Amino acid sequence: MPNYEKVEFQTLDGLTLRGRLFRAEGAGGNRTAAVVITPPYVIVQDVMVSDIAVYFSQQGITALTYDTRSFGESDGQPRCELDLSKQVDDYSDAFTFLASLPSVDPSKIGFWGISFCATVALNAAALDRRSRFVISVGPIVKASDENPYPIDKVHRVLTKALRDRESQLRGNTPFYVESTCEDGSNPTGFGPELGIEAYELVQRIAASGIAPNFSTQLTLQSFAKILRWHPMQDIKWLGETPMMLMIPGDDTVSLPEEQMRLFDMITGPKRVEVAAGKSHFNVLASEGFEGLMDMQVEFIKQTLGLSS
């Protein structure tokens, strides 16, 4: 079992987010660099990100993971409502929590994300000038101005979302949809289609029982909130914050060429690595994991001027 401490911290709007602190090994009482890590989409911290956090901690970097608001162990109502704009703010509150720890050097904290949260992490780093670095693995970039959503599908979802809003105001429960359809399509008909691999992943997690707070569903309002989120406008403000982009070479959810356009848009210090033969969801799974993680550790240590 990974060695971690259960922790919690407050957000500015009064929620309690619950996570796990993986302290840097071999620190010898010295303050260490640290990284904020969140699981993407409907995934919870029991899955996927613990291995990342353990690896960083073994390399002398403290790691904080937490369930995003309204998912897993964290507070937030309605449950399973994806609010990416609020998640951006939560990265900053997680930073503040880490910076308050006597074992962490507040001048050496950065952000990490994968898939949807890879874009959220970039957005957060662009807006929070305290972040010393950001690592983005397979960011979803289809929400950019270069890839507008079909207007007819947008209007259809907005109409349904407004009806659901009216219903909730009458005291009814929120309307929920599956996060991914069985054929891999987006349940609302617009936005990124995560593919059959995503459907199989969430079904596998649900069946395994390893994450008792996990749900395969999202509120319908989640998709209206995605529509109102425009991260590419903010990411342009990343400035001189060093960024590492890791692109899954066989990504069919967020195409490698789209991710490269994002990389080219960044004007500050940056590094790109392509994980050959890796898909969107298995980029940091099993074979090749250590090599890809070593690249990220090297990037952090070089950026912060730390010895290897």
UniProtKB/Swiss-Prot annotation:
Protein name per UniProt: Polyketide transferase claH
Superkingdom of the organism of origin: Eukaryota
Any one GO biological process: monocarboxylic acid biosynthetic process
Positions of the UniProt region annotated as Abhydrolase domain: 50-280
Its job: Polyketide transferase; part of the cla gene cluster that produces clavatol and ortho-quinone methide. The clavatol biosynthesis cluster cla and the terrestric acid cluster tra are both involved in the production of peniphenones and penilactones. The non-reducing PKS claF is responsible for the formation of clavatol from successive condensations of 3 malonyl-CoA units, presumably with a simple acetyl-CoA starter unit, and 2 methylation steps.
Organism: Penicillium crustosum
Pathway terms, separated by semicolons: Secondary metabolite biosynthesis
Family: Belongs to the polyketide transferase af380 family.
One of the Pfam families matching this protein, by short name: Hydrolase_4
PANTHER family per UniProt: DLTD N-TERMINAL DOMAIN PROTEIN (AFU_ORTHOLOGUE AFUA_8G00380)-RELATED (PTHR47751:SF2), SUPERFAMILY HYDROLASE, PUTATIVE (AFU_ORTHOLOGUE AFUA_2G16580)-RELATED (PTHR47751)
SUPFAM superfamilies hit by this protein: alpha/beta-Hydrolases (SSF53474)
Known EC number: 2.3.-.-
Main enzyme class: transferase
GO molecular function: transferase activity
